[in-house]
Amino acid sequence: MIARIWSGESPLWRLLLPLSWLYGLVSGAIRLSYKLGFKRAWRAPVPVVVVGNLTAGGNGKTPVVIWLVEKLQQRGVRVGVVSRGYGGKAAAYPLLLTPETTTAEAGDEPVLIYQRTGAPVAVAPERAAAVKAILAAHNVQIIITDDGLQHYRLARDIEIVVIDGVRRFGNGWWLPAGPMRERASRLKTVDAAIVNGGVARAGEIPMQLAPGLAVNLRTGARCDVAQLSNIVAMAGIGHPPRFFATLEACGAHPQKCVPLADHQTLAPADVQALVGEGQTLVMTEKDAVKCRAFAEDNWWFLPVDARLSGEQPDKLLEHITSLVR
């Protein structure tokens, strides 16, 4: 229903317009207060790059963060990552991730980024506190903030927006009548717009999510996902249909697709109940970090990597590395 309202297919969005006007007024006032100097943002002693969204819902932001961290690491840059840690609840903040940190403490996306990149990761509702925690423990040269485009309390040097190339901005209205956190005109002020799927427009960087080999949660064995049989697909991400479509494109045709809420807590019994005898469970990598501790032999995940095309990605990386002292 939310998807139909935000796309404009359902006329119910009109009923929510008063709330959207209020949301837009408040969010605009917050940004203006920092722009005019009534409120002050904290500036880190190292460059800060924000990777965020203009819309609610999954746009492919986390794969972009991983891509950016890995590309900078390949260039010899020491990178730290901060996040709000949505979906997790730590005993105290800021929380600096370790190999023992769970998704219940830090949230699924920070744990995934930490495991994939090995970069220092810290979470805190106040992102400046997370940055300070990393700087106190690690000699990093740059900070990437996973989400937080609208978190103006943290000053930033580079802003990158990730856009769903198929859904783009829906009906264009602020939450809750539409998907917008800020209006599309905000694109004029960011340093780069990366478009996940669909057709990129002038000035935008095209991106595709490229699936790798399926990985067994228990053994680490790898195989082509099309070789798995009797698949039950599970996706607890911002836009589950994208994952199911990826499986189909890989030649894996699920018998059943189970969409879950983004950042949903997964109980062992609930996940086990999804799979019958002779079936294979295939999930996203983000779900896998939550399920690995209680995984069964027939559970697999399909990792995806961001692939950015054209000359713009290299120019963006050059611009970012030029800020590193």
From Swiss-Prot:
Family annotation (InterPro entries): LpxK, P-loop_NTPase
According to UniProt, this protein's pathway is:
Glycolipid biosynthesis; lipid IV(A) biosynthesis; lipid IV(A) from (3R)-3-hydroxytetradecanoyl-[acyl-carrier-protein] and UDP-N-acetyl-alpha-D-glucosamine: step 6/6
Q: Name one GO cellular component term.
A: plasma membrane
Q: Which GO terms describe its molecular function?
A: ATP binding; tetraacyldisaccharide 4'-kinase activity
The protein's Enzyme Commission number: 2.7.1.130
The record's SUPFAM superfamilies line, in alphabetical order, gives: P-loop containing nucleoside triphosphate hydrolases
Query: Does Transmembrane helix appear among the keywords?
Result: no
Q: Which residues bind ATP?
A: T55, A56, G57, G58, N59, G60, K61, T62
Record keywords, A-Z: ATP-binding, Kinase, Lipid A biosynthesis, Lipid biosynthesis, Lipid metabolism, Nucleotide-binding, Transferase
Task: Please write the reaction equations for the catalytic activity of this protein.
Answer: a lipid A disaccharide + ATP = a lipid IVA + ADP + H(+)
User: Quick one: a GO biological-process term for this protein?
Assistant: lipid A biosynthetic process
Q: What class of enzyme is it?
A: transferase
Out of the domains of life, which is the source? Bacteria
Q: State the family named in the UniProt similarity comment for this chain.
A: Belongs to the LpxK family.
Report the protein's function: Transfers the gamma-phosphate of ATP to the 4'-position of a tetraacyldisaccharide 1-phosphate intermediate (termed DS-1-P) to form tetraacyldisaccharide 1,4'-bis-phosphate (lipid IVA).
Name of protein:
Tetraacyldisaccharide 4'-kinase
Q: Which organism is it from?
A: Salmonella paratyphi C (strain RKS4594)
Top-level taxonomy? Bacteria, Pseudomonadati, Pseudomonadota, Gammaproteobacteria, Enterobacterales
Gene responsible for this protein: lpxK
